[in-house]
Amino acid sequence: MGLRLATFNIENLMSRFDFAGFRNALRQDRALSIYQIDDQRQYEALEAARAVATTDDTRQLSALAMAAVRADVICLQEVDNLEALDAFERHYLYRMIGRGYRQRHVSRGNDGRGIDIAVLARDETGEGQRIEIRDIQTHAFRTVSDFGLQSSELAEMGVDGGQKLFRRDCVVVDMAVGGRPFTLVALHLKSMGPSRDPDIPGREWTMPMRRAELAATRQILTDKFDGGPERMRWAICGDLNDYRERIVIHGEFEEEFRFEHVREADSSLDVLLEDGFAFDPTQKLDPMQRWTLFHSRGPGRRHLCQLDYILLSPKLAKANPDAVPQIERRGQPWRTIVPPGQEVERFPRTGWDRPKASDHCPIALELNI
């Protein structure tokens, strides 16, 4: 009995205009930075026009990327609200692609920008098995002390026991696929920056927060399944904003690039993976093929890494020994530098930097439930 599961950071699926760039140059779009803008009213009119002009191409590409992975159930990150998701599903996924998702849920989480986690499901799998969402639980309201995860590292970040733990949410979805129970955990963890200490990189500075989020996720699953989560069918999906390895890119524009595979000494993902609590099926891919994001801060600061994951319970991993993830890269912008042999034919109208489907690649996995 097959279920095709996917996760995708859709990158700012917004229904609101963001006018913060008028007072904060770091938030201003680069196109507007070229022009002399006299007042806030003019800025807001120009920003609204810019956003509307670019949205259609961007969301066509997002829909193409989602359609390409053919998921029965998909977790999305960076969704503004249910209204934005409904409009995208109706006008892009359904009308443009021809097959949509009738079951849709958006969590109202803790993100300061209001970007939330969404879960979409079809009524049936591709094999015709009914998908029934039976319960959805949010953990956005739970605090650090609820999980007993207070620490000196979090205190140094300014996080005390009374603060909400999840930067967005931990959404637990209980469903039945062809009558068989399956639990999906949807996450979007704390980002890797910025750092408040100029001597500590953003990833290192923020890692205690992601460790705590994953430790809490582990507690939630352990409590839910009475101390025996290894015996149950569950998967963790989402943008976990950390990596255990990366591909460092050496070279300059229009030169021959060199790619160096680097293992990281420490990762928040170790909380789930180090002792076999969960399994990462992307490990079946070649190390040079696991990446889902191209990171660039200019020459000498470029790498490819995996931030997006579908992690399986021991029971589900054992039942799917040959399941290999599909990473869809045709919506990546042309500026993404890829290792030899990984070139793909981009979707039509993909730009050098934009429009693009997202800065992330969707990842999908066919599972035997």
Residue ranges with predicted function:
Residues 1-96, 103-116, 161, 351, ...:
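N-terminal, active-site-proximal structural segment of metallo-dependent hydrolase catalytic domains
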Residues 2-12, 181-198:
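Active-site-proximal beta-strand elements of phosphoester/diester hydrolases
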Residues 11, 79-80, 188-190, 240-243:
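Catalytic metal-binding/acid-base residues of hydrolase active sites
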Residues 20-24, 89-93, 200, 249-259:
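Short secondary-structure boundary/capping segments
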Residues 58, 62, 81-84, 116, ...:
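Stable alpha-helical elements in mature extracytoplasmic
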Residues 73, 79-189:
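Structured beta-strand-rich core segments of catalytic domains in phosphoester-bond hydrolases
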Residues 82, 165, 219-235, 240-369:
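Metal-dependent phosphoester-hydrolase catalytic domains
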Residues 84, 113, 193-195, 243-247:
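Extracytoplasmic/secreted cell-surface and envelope-processing proteins
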